[in-house]
Design a protein with these regions (language model features):
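C-terminal motif of bacterial Sec signal peptides marking the signal peptidase cleavage site
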Residues: 3-6
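Bacterial signal peptide processing site
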Residues: 8-12
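Post-signal peptide N-terminal segment of mature Sec-exported envelope proteins
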Residues: 16-37
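Glycine-rich, compositionally biased intrinsically disordered regions
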Residues: 17, 47-53, 160-169
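Short, solvent-exposed coil/turn segments at beta-strand boundaries
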Residues: 31, 43, 118-121
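Structured domain cores in non-transmembrane regions
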Residues: 43-113
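Extracytoplasmic electrostatic interaction patches
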Residues: 84-171
């Protein structure tokens, strides 16, 4: 039995090796216009939410909005978004089979559900601000490098940790 699969990509989700700083709105429609820190999230849905809730002991209160943190005794805030960007393709073989069957037998499409396929890719998108700067990830921000260092460490800790309660005792 020979099986041939032919797909045409309609949209390909971005691959981010470590992290990326970009305009939120450019990364995905509906995100803020500010600069954001983006990384791929290989964990299950709501894992980052649970991690932040536990790490900052927020008890479910304002977990994804205006989370305060300190860098060199200065208070910053971050908000985050769990974003899905699917890779979408058209599968030609099922489409062609349905066309052939429809012409030969006047049948309704049999493989209609297989005409397209989607594979979800999840990302964590973080924006940072403080009382004096609306966009701490902007190249013009005096805090950009400090904030980037903090976010890199936060990402590294999140990805390396399975039991988030350990973080409370570590900090």
């Amino acid at each position: 039995v020979l099986l041939v699969q032919s797909c045409i990509p309609l949209r390909i989700a971005p691959t981010i090796k470590d992290y990326k700083v970009t305009k939120g709105k450019r990364f995905k429609k509906g995100l803020p216009k500010k600069n954001v820190f983006v990384f791929e999230d290989p964990k299950d849905a709501d894992e980052f939410y649970n991690y932040i809730n536990t790490k900052f002991q927020l008890n479910g209160y304002y977990v994804d909005v205006q989370v305060p943190f300190l860098i060199e005794d200065k208070t910053y805030y971050f908000s985050f978004y769990e974003v899905e960007i699917p890779t979408k393709t058209i599968n030609l073989v099922p489409l062609m089979l349905d066309v052939a069957l429809a012409k030969a037998t006047d049948m309704e499409p049999v493989f209609e559900d297989a005409h397209t396929s989607r594979k979800g890719n999840w990302y964590i998108v973080i924006e940072v601000f403080n009382d004096t700067e609306k966009d701490c990830l902007s190249e013009a921000s005096v805090s950009q490098q400090l904030v980037l260092s903090y976010l890199r460490d936060l990402k590294k800790e999140y990805l390396a940790t399975d039991n988030y309660d350990e973080i409370v005792f570590k900090n």
